């Protein structure tokens, strides 16, 4: 009986141990599953905060919610161990980090959009530049009317003057015929006759060259050569009178400037090989750019004027006026172009203005243009500065102090040279904190009349300075 009691006691103890072990194992499994679920819950709650759902206004509610879940591991347990003030500081820092990240993301997105727009603009400018070069090449290759097409498959209709003779610039185009008006036989006949005429003309040129050599020897020793020299001197006087008249018209009214432009344009065929004529024609194109109101006409005048100034520079690099007006037309053309083209024109503008000042340092116009360039560069936008740095090795750099020195130099060389120049001086002094000097130059600017369009445009700036500086 005692043996059975002992056996029953041992079995009861063994059962108690097994039950205790099973209970502990079951509790471990439950705790492990609950810990994993809590970890997943913590990650799902922290994810929205990284995606712009954090709100500082609900900080107290979030702290209460974390405290209301007892026994959970993770951030809630960590925060619950901190005092109320410490929890608020941690949440404030997290909100600040998230807000900074969101602001950074918006800035990156804005920069990406700007770069995409800039890339599209550059591609468009390159395409338009290539198309313009192709048009110029076609104009140079086909200076006369193009030959009519022999294609009969196209339904296009080309129009050409039917007067028979070649039209000049002064003539007007008369009646029109279609491209397929002539028969194939007539075109073949015309080509054969043209070939025959070419052969005859070649023989004529050869004979003419031989005769001209003999004639030159005779003319050189004849009394008529003295008369030819007199004609050359009279022709030189004529061109000098023409250039003097163009200078006087340039200094006159708007109508005078238009007359000067037409005068030079009409005489381009006769004197277009002279450098002093070409830069004056470029100057006249600059005047027309200022006078016209239509944007397309402004760009056309500026482009043609830049080409004339470039042709003048090809005649020689020692002409200060050619460099000066090339720079002016670069600036006028840049007003109708994109940001990258404007920055490139800015480099070219500075280069030619510096060259003009080097060749003619006593001319106030060069110093005025340099001062205006420095002032505009000192006020470039952030995007323009970054674009210049990205596209060019040496970015544009200038200060308001640089601009002031150039404007003062122009005023020193010729007092009262420009009303706009005095307004610029006043603006520079104001930005440098010298209001008394700014007020002085503002009063001096009011004494000058409006001569150029730039002077008139600065009237509004002058009035604003009056309000800021007072009288």
Swiss-Prot record:
Q: Which family does it belong to?
A: Belongs to the RMDN family.
Chain's role: Involved in cellular calcium homeostasis regulation. May participate in differentiation and apoptosis of keratinocytes. Overexpression induces apoptosis.
**Keyword DNA-binding among UniProt keywords:** no
The gene it comes from is Rmdn3
Q: Where is the composition biased (Acidic residues)?
A: 191-201
Any Gene Ontology CC annotation: mitochondrion
Coiled-coil annotated residue ranges, if any: 91-125
| Tree of life domain | Eukaryota
Could you describe the post-translational modifications of this protein? Answer: Phosphorylation at Thr-160 of the FFAT motif activates interaction with MOSPD2, VAPA and VAPB.
Where in or outside the cell it occurs: the entry states: Mitochondrion outer membrane; Cytoplasm; Nucleus; Cytoplasm, Cytoskeleton, Spindle
Cite the entry's keywords alphabetically.
Apoptosis, Coiled coil, Cytoplasm, Cytoskeleton, Differentiation, Membrane, Microtubule, Mitochondrion, Mitochondrion outer membrane, Nucleus, Phosphoprotein, Transmembrane, Transmembrane helix
The species this protein was found in: Rattus norvegicus (Rat)
Q: What remark about domains does the record contain? A: The transmembrane region is required for mitochondrial localization. The FFAT motif is required for interaction with MOSPD2. The FFAT motif is involved in the interaction with VAPA and VAPB and its phosphorylation regulates these interactions.
Tell me where the sequence motif FFAT sits in this chain.
157-163
Q: Which BP terms does GO give this entry?
A: apoptotic process; cell differentiation; intracellular calcium ion homeostasis
Q: What Gene Ontology molecular function terms does this protein carry?
A: microtubule binding
Q: Cytoplasmic side: which ranges?
A: 36-471
Protein name (database record):
Regulator of microtubule dynamics protein 3
Q: Where is the signal peptide?
A: none
């Amino acid at each position: 009986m005692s043996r059975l009691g002992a056996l029953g006691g041992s079995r009861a103890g063994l059962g108690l141990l097994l039950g205790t072990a099973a209970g502990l194992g079951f509790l471990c499994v439950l705790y492990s599953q609950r810990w994993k679920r809590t970890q997943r819950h913590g990650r799902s709650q922290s994810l929205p905060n990284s995606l712009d759902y954090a709100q500082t206004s609900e900080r107290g509610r979030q702290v209460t919610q974390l405290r209301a879940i007892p026994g959970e591991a993770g951030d809630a347990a960590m925060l619950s161990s901190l005092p109320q003030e410490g929890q608020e500081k941690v949440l404030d820092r997290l909100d600040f980090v998230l807000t900074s990240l969101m602001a950074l993301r918006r800035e990156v997105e804005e920069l990406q959009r700007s770069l995409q727009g800039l890339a599209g603009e550059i591609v468009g400018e390159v395409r338009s530049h290539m198309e313009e070069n192709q048009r110029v090449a076609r104009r140079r290759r086909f200076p006369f009317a193009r030959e009519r097409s022999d294609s009969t498959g196209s339904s296009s209709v080309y129009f050409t003057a039917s007067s028979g003779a070649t039209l000049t610039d002064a003539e007007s185009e008369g009646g029109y015929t279609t491209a397929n008006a002539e028969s194939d036989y007539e075109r073949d006949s015309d080509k054969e006759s043209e070939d025959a005429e070419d052969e005859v003309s070649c023989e004529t040129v050869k004979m003419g060259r031989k005769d001209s050599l003999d004639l030159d020897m005779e003319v050189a020793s004849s009394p008529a050569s003295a008369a030819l020299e007199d004609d050359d001197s009279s022709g030189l006087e004529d061109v000098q009178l023409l250039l003097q008249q163009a200078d006087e018209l340039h200094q006159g009214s708007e109508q005078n400037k238009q007359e000067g432009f037409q005068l030079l344009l009409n005489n381009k065929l006769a004197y277009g090989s002279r450098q002093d004529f070409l830069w004056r024609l470029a100057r006249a194109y600059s005047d027309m750019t200022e006078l016209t109101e239509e944007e397309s006409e402004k760009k056309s005048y500026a482009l043609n004027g830049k080409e004339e100034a470039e042709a003048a520079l090809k005649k020689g690099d020692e002409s200060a006026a050619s460099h000066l007006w090339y720079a002016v037309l670069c600036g006028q053309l840049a007003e109708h172009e994109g940001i990258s083209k404007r920055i490139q024109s800015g480099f070219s503008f500075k280069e030619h203005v510096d060259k003009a000042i080097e060749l003619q340092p006593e001319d106030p116009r060069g110093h005025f243009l340099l001062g205006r360039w420095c002032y505009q560069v000192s006020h470039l936008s952030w995007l323009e500065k970054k674009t210049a740095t990205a596209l060019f090795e040496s970015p544009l750099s200038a200060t308001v102090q640089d601009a002031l020195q150039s404007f003062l130099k122009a005023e020193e060389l010729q007092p009262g040279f420009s009303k706009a120049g005095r307004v610029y001086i006043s603006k520079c002094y104001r930005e440098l904190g010298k209001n008394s000097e700014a007020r002085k130059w503002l009063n001096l600017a009011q004494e000058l009349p409006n001569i150029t369009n730039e002077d008139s445009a600065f009237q509004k700036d002058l009035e604003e300075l009056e309000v800021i500086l007072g009288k």
